[in-house]
Amino acid sequence: MYTVELGKLVEKMNLENCTPEIDISSIQITQPDVNRPALQLTGFFDYFDSDRVQIIGNVEHAYMQKMEKDHGLGIMKKLMSFKMPCIVFCRGIEVSEDFKEVAIEEGVPIFRTEKTTSSFMAEVIRWLKVELAPRISIHGVLVDVYGEGILIMGESGIGKSEAALELIKRGHRLVTDDLVEIKKVSDDTLIGTAPDITRHFIELRGIGIIDVKTLFGVESVKNTQSIDLVIKLEEWNRDKEYDRLGLEEQYIEFLGNRVVCHNIPIRPGRNLAVICESAAVNYRQKKMGYNAAQELYNRVTNNLLKKSK
């Protein structure tokens, strides 16, 4: 299970700390979802998702304001007796002194934001989904080509980094070389990024390590990119049948998500950068509803039907 420090969330969302007396350095968030404790304020604590970040909006605050003081204090103590990362008040709602006292007593940090409840929840969930996403690391190169994330794979020394360097010279952007960290942020989205230690570097055999950001400028690099297409480079095999039409897509699976994969045989004289660019544009065309292979198939079929009449 992956975790993210509460302090990182506070910094990212620019939250105001209403209980600075509480040390948050050891508090970890483990759940990407959030919870609005509406039913819990009425005293119903069955199925309470206390391990999530708790959000208080106008509705919850208005209900607490109408409670009798003793009853309200009892509900607050019961609520914060559960182990939770924190409670966030949205819309700039003022936190009562009674609420702060109970929070400090129970060790539950309280924060505040000026953002609306729904927009804050959406922003937090989206960020936590990425931070807490399941992940793997694979050997390869990830490049942004015309907005499509191209993951170049293949055996060591086959030319992945050289292909990436040529793509960079042609105006495309490097995400990571050699090691790709892949996160599954949804059932149809994979995000690739570089380890901090190797970010923006490329290794070229015979030359060594080069800093792409320094050599080609900030426009030549990118920190993250969705993985839309995989290109697997392999040595040319005369006995192997390679796809020449592209009517049927081949796929590779990462973390349960399937990604379109093209096996590209390597021979002297083949321009890998142009092949990668063509694959990216063709993939985008297919997403927009046009399939060149299907169009050719339809033309041939129609031509044969005409001749048979």
Swiss-Prot record:
Enzyme class, broadest EC rank: transferase
Lineage top rank: taxon: Bacteria
* Region ranges (Important for the catalytic mechanism of dephosphorylation): 265-270
List its EC numbers. 2.7.11.-, 2.7.4.-
InterPro entries for this protein: HPr(Ser)_kin/Pase, Hpr_kin/Pase_C, Hpr_kin/Pase_Hpr_N, P-loop_NTPase, Ser_kin/Pase_Hpr-like_N_sf
Could you tell me which CDD domains the record lists for this protein?
HprK_C (cd01918)
The reactions it catalyses are:
[HPr protein]-L-serine + ATP = [HPr protein]-O-phospho-L-serine + ADP + H(+); [HPr protein]-O-phospho-L-serine + phosphate + H(+) = [HPr protein]-L-serine + diphosphate
Q: Provide this UniProt record's keywords sorted from A to Z.
A: ATP-binding, Carbohydrate metabolism, Kinase, Magnesium, Metal-binding, Multifunctional enzyme, Nucleotide-binding, Serine/threonine-protein kinase, Transferase
Q: Where is this region: Important for the catalytic mechanism of both phosphorylation and dephosphorylation?
A: 202-211
Q: Does the keyword ATP-binding apply?
A: yes
Which family would the database say this protein is a member of?
Answer: Belongs to the HPrK/P family.
What does the miscellaneous comment read? Answer: Both phosphorylation and phosphorolysis are carried out by the same active site and suggest a common mechanism for both reactions.
Domain comment in the entry? The Walker A ATP-binding motif also binds Pi and PPi.
Function field: Catalyzes the ATP- as well as the pyrophosphate-dependent phosphorylation of a specific serine residue in HPr, a phosphocarrier protein of the phosphoenolpyruvate-dependent sugar phosphotransferase system (PTS). HprK/P also catalyzes the pyrophosphate-producing, inorganic phosphate-dependent dephosphorylation (phosphorolysis) of seryl-phosphorylated HPr (P-Ser-HPr).
Q: What is this protein called?
A: HPr kinase/phosphorylase
Q: Please tell me the species this chain comes from.
A: Lachnoclostridium phytofermentans (strain ATCC 700394 / DSM 18823 / ISDg) (Clostridium phytofermentans)
